[in-house]
Design a protein with these regions (language model features):
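FMN-binding flavodoxin-like domain, especially the glycine-rich phosphate-binding loop
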Residues: 3, 8-183
Length: 183
């Protein structure tokens, strides 16, 4: 279930701003965030995708993303972005590149995590154009005590893909990123 979807407001409608290149940045200890991120990218329909998986280690060097759209997906622990994710994202920057902020939470609440990720995007040179929160199996889930067991499931993934499609349609309405009011 998509619990919250935010899109940038348009400043004006012109022709088309399309992206053939996308970058996925994710921290996904339970693989839920990665699954959601890949599905959002499928919905965006970009040609080439590169990935920075922060689950096991941070990049050896700072990373600056100059082109394409970046989908950033992180889990929520206790209503906040996982501290380890923030530490590993520290050397990642955008150069006025559009970003989609996505948080995945364990069916409790994501509190201000989506806002926190949006603020991180702005502080690191990205222009957040859309954001969403999705449910993934809670890290405390056990077979005898499932918490959002099996999530994201097919309906969740369909919604993630539809979200990516919506973001793609939004961006196709503009020629430049300057025309999009960030979220």
């Amino acid at each position: 279930m998509v619990t919250n979807v935010i899109f940038a407001k348009e400043k004006s409608t012109l022709y088309s701003m399309t992206y053939d290149y996308a970058h996925l940045i994710c921290f996904s200890p339970t693989h839920s965030s990665h699954m959601i991120g890949e599905t959002v990218l499928q919905g965006l329909g970009t040609g080439h995708v590169s990935e920075t998986d922060l689950t096991y280690e941070k990049p050896e060097e700072n990373l600056t993303i100059h082109s394409g759209i970046t989908v950033i997906v992180v889990p929520v622990y206790g209503g906040r972005i996982a501290e380890t994710a923030l530490e590993r994202m520290e050397g990642i920057y955008g150069q006025d590149s559009p970003a989609v902020a996505v948080v995945v939470y364990g069916n409790r609440d994501y509190d201000d995590a989506l806002l926190e990720l949006r603020d991180w995007c702005v502080a690191h040179g990205f222009v957040p154009v859309a954001g969403a929160a999705f449910i993934g199996e809670h890290s405390y889930s056990r077979p005898n005590r499932p918490i959002a067991g099996g999530r994201p499931d097919n309906p969740d993934l369909q919604k993630a893909r539809a979200f990516g499609e919506q973001v793609g349609r939004l961006l196709n309405r503009f020629q430049t990123l300057d025309e999009v009011a960030p979220i």
